[in-house]
Each structure stands twice: as C-alpha cells, then as structure tokens.
Regions:
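Phosphate-binding site recognition
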Residues: 1-254
C-alpha cells in the first residue's frame, strides 16, 4: 500500500458506469465519464434544427440525450449548470445557452409489448407520464387546452395522443415565452417490436402522424433531436421532413 503525504490529495477512484444513462447520476456519483459535451456545441454551431442520430444499442445514445436535457432545461438551471463545470462545453462560447429552454424528453427504450393493444397502452402511459411532469401548466391553460391536456394526463380514450408532443410544445412556449428543445430517444424501439410481433402497420400508422406533428409541423420547438437504430430510409414515418439531418456512427461530425 502506497502512503500519501499529508498535503497530498488522494484521488478517489471513479466507478465504471455500467447501465447508467442519466447524466446527473453519472456526474454526481463520480462515475467515469468520457466527455461528450462537445456534442452540444456541434449541434448549436451547425444550425440544424432536426437531427436523427442512428447508433447500435449500448452506444450511449440515451446518456447523450440525458446530457442535452440537463444542459438546455430551464428548470433547475442553476443546479444543472454545476454538472457541466470543468467539462468541454463550459469552455465554449455556447455555454450561455445553458438553461435557456423548456425541454420535452420522451424515451421508448423500455418498450417491450407483443401486441398493438398493449403497445398502444404503453405509448399512452409514456405520454401520460410526460404530461404529469408538466401538470403545473394546467393553471394557465385555456378551457379547451385544459380539456385536451387532461384527456392525456388522465389517459382517457378521447386523448389526442398523436398530437401530444406538438400540443405540449405550444403549452410550454406560451408559459415560458421560449421555444422548446424536443428530445425523442429510441424512436424505433416500438417499430422493431411491432415488426417482430405482427402489428407493424398499427405502429407505423400511429407514428406517422405523431412524428409529423411533433417534428415537421412543430413551430414551437427550436431544436428536435431523435435517436434510434434504424436509418430513416427504412421507415416512412419521417416522410416529408426534407431538412432532417441523419447522422450515423460513421460520421465524425455530430
């Protein structure tokens, strides 16, 4: 055992982040973190507003999306700022963008359903949980918007789930006066499961409208980032999104 002098600091050994995809947990618990915060600068510098990252499983997609959430989110921005101290983005001219936007973050990575009835219920549950996070908006909503919000929040059959993200973007813009950063993680997990279990057309029909409204027709979202495994050419759910930037693992930038 090597003894240190009394004035020498003993560096605490960092833990390996096995299965950790929450950026805050990663930083606060001293896990070993390979600094990917330069991605934030690349996104902002590129001026691209719609980005699809395609990577294999276990390639850190969800952790990067969590990082983006903690960087941009206007909620708890002062506490979140501390997470980025001494990381690459803290030295960037774009660091002043930290904590400047409401953030919508939804993930389908845990989707495992084997039929459409359960699959649609799982999707609704994910959207309901998202709305629950923003239930404070209810105090400021007009009557018709409040009804639409509650139909989703209470998971009623009348809920307009295909427009849930686009409507929530508008509610947040009207509340904060700032455009949203929209993050959709593992967009294709339901598609892959549906293809393997015989309800592919049901999922595609739902997500065509879901993504068209959330990504293409959403003027209340400033930046939209999507992750998955499948390339866009394999699915028709993003048809019409002419300026969607697709970035694969083989590309250096972004």
């Amino acid at each position: 055992m090597i003894k240190k002098g009394k004035n020498e600091k003993i560096e605490k050994k960092k833990n390996l982040p096995v299965g950790i995809d929450n950026f805050e947990v990663m930083i606060q618990n001293n896990y070993y973190y390979f600094d990917k915060t330069g991605l934030i600068e690349e996104i902002l510098e590129s001026g691209t507003t719609r980005i699809l990252f395609t990577r294999p499983r276990r390639f850190g997609k969800s952790l990067n999306m969590s990082m983006l959430k903690y960087f941009f989110d206007v909620k708890n921005k002062d506490e979140n700022k501390k997470l980025f101290e001494n990381l690459e983005i803290s030295k960037s001219e774009y660091f002043d963008r930290q904590g400047q936007n409401p953030v919508i973050f939804i993930s389908f990575k845990d989707f495992e359903e084997t039929n459409w009835e359960n699959g649609f219920n799982s999707i609704k549950e994910e959207i309901k949980s998202l709305y629950n996070e923003f239930r404070f908006l209810r105090e400021k909503l007009e009557k018709s918007d409040l009804m639409d919000f509650d139909n989703i929040w209470l998971k009623k059959k009348e809920g307009n789930y295909s427009r849930a993200l686009s409507n929530l973007s508008r509610y947040l813009f009207e509340y904060y006066g700032k455009k949203v950063v929209l993050l959709i993680d593992e967009y294709d997990k339901p598609i892959i499961k549906a293809h393997a279990n015989g309800y592919y057309n049901n999922v595609i029909n739902f997500f065509k409208t879901f993504f068209e409204k959330a990504v293409k027709g959403n003027d209340y979202a400033e930046i939209k980032v999507i992750t998955g495994i499948l390339r866009i050419a394999k699915e028709g759910i993003f048809s019409g999104l002419n300026n969607l930037e697709v970035h694969t693992i083989l590309e250096k930038k972004i």
